[in-house]
Amino acid sequence: MTPEILPIDQYDAQLEEKTGRLGAMMAPFDAPAPAVFRSPVSHYRMRAEFRIWHDGDDLYHIMFDQQTKQRIRVDQFPAASELINRLMPVLLNALRAEPVLRRKLFQLDYLSTLSGEIAVSLLYHKALDDEWRQRARELCDELRAQGFALQLIGRATKTKICLDRDYVDECLPVAGRQMIYRQVENSFTQPNAMMNIQMLEWALSVTQGSTGDLLELYCGNGNFSLALARNFERVLATEIAKPSVAAAQYNIAANQIDNVQIIRMAAEEFTQAMNGVRQFNRLQGIDLAGYRCETIFVDPPRSGLDDGTAKLVQAYPRILYISCNPETLCANLETLSQTHRISQLALFDQFPYTHHMECGVLLEKRQ
């Protein structure tokens, strides 16, 4: 596999290998056979980051070989969305012709959507001034005239220049509803949009008929909270990153959802608040005791749940856990399986042709 060539003929074999590997990892926990969700075989990534290599007045996208660390020129990137691939050569041609925008540019970050919007962050090893802003504005207008629904953002040390806005608005069809999601550049979003839709629909299907409220830790821009809100009386969600909280609040309003409350705090702090260890000013006006959370949803970072949060999670009758690292999931299951059993297991091929697996488990309290 190279950046410009995907081994599409090996897609089924690599998915079969992952399915077997996940099954073996989950066997000690008496998990059922996984439901397996396929990715598109190409153009599945909505985000891409490239370093920029300068060769005299020329420049091009590069990536580094993970083994040899050699640089590889990338003119097309079939793992990325068709929109990113359409913009890549057009943007580089425009940058080649503009020394102010080209000089000291070292990275381009693309963030695209199924809705047709795209944002590009240009990263520099130099200060950005008014001349840069003027040239960037001209470039943005030129590319918009060519049909790209584009946002350009300039970044340098301690500097961020946003010509118009630093986000794109995504629209995903989820179980019969169009869900609007504001996605902010340089914040976490699900990289594989088609797989994200399948993850949301799986989470909806396994929580159908739920009673009580839902608690979500690490909610990001509200990706899961908002889709799952239809299955619960109320949703209480926590997130620490300010841009993600702001995006989540926008998404609540844009989707006309009235039963979701987002609070800005770390999972560890929330654990302290729930256990009455500490009081937080941020929770004034929120009656934690009034929530009847019978399901907790967690989508933690690769490191998994810390010990305190794992113990907090055990207090809930049902745990819905999305994991981007089955190894740390298994470490957490050593604790969680003492009180809960796995009733549903899913494999989501979020990152085709790589070793990485994303999976979901629904755990229910043992009788």
From Swiss-Prot:
Pfam family, one: tRNA_U5-meth_tr
GO CC, alphabetical: cytosol
Alphabetized CDD domains for the sequence: AdoMet_MTases (cd02440)
EC numbers on record: 2.1.1.-, 2.1.1.35
Binding site residues for S-adenosyl-L-methionine: 190, 218, 223, 239, 299
A molecular-function term among this protein's GO annotations: tRNA (uracil(54)-C5)-methyltransferase activity, S-adenosyl methionine-dependent
Record key words, sorted: Methyltransferase, S-adenosyl-L-methionine, Transferase, tRNA processing
Catalytic activity annotation: uridine(54) in tRNA + S-adenosyl-L-methionine = 5-methyluridine(54) in tRNA + S-adenosyl-L-homocysteine + H(+); uridine(341) in tmRNA + S-adenosyl-L-methionine = 5-methyluridine(341) in tmRNA + S-adenosyl-L-homocysteine + H(+)
Active site: 324 (nucleophile), 358 (proton acceptor)
GO biological process: one example: tRNA methylation
Xref: Gene3D superfamilies: 2.40.50.1070, Vaccinia Virus protein VP39
InterPro entries hit by this protein: MeTrfase_TrmA_AS, MeTrfase_TrmA_CS, SAM-dependent_MTases_sf, TrmA_MeTrfase, U5_MeTrfase_fam
Protein family membership: Belongs to the class I-like SAM-binding methyltransferase superfamily. RNA M5U methyltransferase family. TrmA subfamily.
Entries under PANTHER family matching the protein: TRNA/TMRNA (URACIL-C(5))-METHYLTRANSFERASE, TRNA_TMRNA (URACIL-C(5))-METHYLTRANSFERASE
Role, per record: Dual-specificity methyltransferase that catalyzes the formation of 5-methyluridine at position 54 (m5U54) in all tRNAs, and that of position 341 (m5U341) in tmRNA (transfer-mRNA).
Protein name, UniProt field: tRNA/tmRNA (uracil-C(5))-methyltransferase
Gene that this polypeptide is encoded by: trmA
